[in-house]
Curated annotation (Swiss-Prot):
Gene Ontology MF, one: proteasome binding
Entry GO CC: cytoplasm; nuclear membrane
Primary subcellular site in the record, as a coarse category: cytoplasm
Organism whose genome encodes this protein: Saccharomyces cerevisiae (strain YJM789) (Baker's yeast)
Region annotation Disordered: where it falls in the sequence: 34-74
Name this polypeptide is given: Tethering factor for nuclear proteasome STS1
Gene of this entry: STS1
Free-text function comment from the UniProt entry: Involved in ubiquitin-mediated protein degradation. Regulatory factor in the ubiquitin/proteasome pathway that controls the turnover of proteasome substrates. Targets proteasomes to the nucleus and facilitates the degradation of nuclear proteins.
Tagged with keyword Cytoplasm: yes
Domain of life (superkingdom): Eukaryota
GO terms under biological process: nuclear protein quality control by the ubiquitin-proteasome system; proteasome localization; protein transport
Family, similarity comment: Belongs to the cut8/STS1 family.
């Protein structure tokens, strides 16, 4: 009894079937064994061609079409608004400077938008304190600023930070006095703090290295006199406000004058001429103050003429 046969037929049977086919007039009579041989031969051929197919996956045996380059997702830069959200302050500023340099026609438009913004006094003070700290951090590590005897080497290292601070201070002061700011109390308070920041800056042993400090204090003296002139002309402030407010400013100004070797003497005298006691006293003090202001303006003009005739530093922020 023959069982289930797997694979090829034995060679003897294949030979017998071949002989029998030759004896029947060269007519090939297919047998079951030949059919199975073809089927198994085709299966072996498929098994040999299977590893050659590069598109067959290693795991799972599922073929995959090679992706074309056009169907791949390509990276792209951020949109303009999304990129601007990630930019910091320095990058914004550099971008604006580069744009205004390449396109000068947009400078006026940018300036108009900037001056239309309302910056708080506290924000200005925070910026000034940061720039003041930069001055202290630029002091050489082997020198102490408390002695106020910094040498020439320290001046060379600190000069860029000093000029940046003083330039920023002057710009902020001019933006916070009349007519830009009508609140005289806020203007005086801001000027008071700015004067204190300048007075406390470390000074140098050589007097010529303190030129920028002294020049700045002279300009602050002119601003003090200008604000006192506005106060003298405003009768409501003279009569309604508490005299202790003005005395507080005068006391602090006196301390600043002592530390600046008398450079703030003129506004101090103008403050002392104010009398808040009565309307008649206020009126008389206003007249005497106006006479002092006329003398102040004449003195300021003479000093400016002397400064223009002499040689001054080209990088001074106050020339």
């Amino acid at each position: 009894m023959m069982g289930f046969e797997w694979g090829f037929k034995p060679s003897s049977k294949i030979t017998q079937s071949t002989v029998s086919s030759q004896g029947t007039g060269n007519v090939m009579i297919p047998t079951a064994g030949v059919k199975q041989k073809r089927r198994y031969a085709n299966e072996e051929q498929e098994e040999e061609e299977l590893p050659r197919n590069k598109n067959v996956m290693k795991y799972g045996g599922v073929s995959k079409r090679r992706p074309q380059p056009g169907s791949l997702i390509r990276g792209q830069p951020l949109p303009l608004l999304r990129g601007m959200e990630l930019m910091n302050k320095n990058q914004y500023r550099q971008l604006l400077v580069d744009l205004m340099t390449k396109h000068p026609e947009i400078q006026q438009s940018v300036h108009t938008r900037v001056i239309g913004l309302d910056f708080s006094i506290q924000k200005c003070l925070d910026m000034l304190k940061q720039k003041s700290e930069a001055v202290y951090q630029s002091i050489p590590y082997n020198r102490s600023y408390e002695s106020n005897k910094l040498d020439d080497y320290a001046f060379v290292r600190m000069k860029p930070q000093i000029l940046e601070f003083l330039n920023c201070l002057v710009d902020f002061i001019l933006d916070n006095i009349p007519p830009r700011l009508e609140n005289l109390h806020a203007s005086l308070k801001f000027l008071d703090i700015c004067t204190e920041l300048v007075i406390k800056l470390p000074r140098f042993e050589l007097a010529s290295n303190n030129y920028y400090y002294d020049k700045c204090i002279e300009q602050l003296s002119h601003v003090w006199c200008t604000l006192i002139e506005h106060v003298a002309r405003d009768r409501i402030i003279l009569l309604a406000d508490n005299s202790s407010v003005w005395k507080s400013h005068m006391t602090r100004l006196q301390v600043y004058n002592e530390h600046s070797n008398g450079l703030l003497e003129r506004p101090l005298q103008l403050f002392k001429s104010l009398d808040m006691g009565s309307p008649s006293a206020a009126s008389s003090s206003t007249l005497s103050l106006q006479e002092s202001i006329i003398y102040h303006h004449d003195t300021m003009t003479a000093n400016e003429n002397n400064n223009n005739s002499g040689s001054a530093a080209t990088d001074s922020p106050f020339n």
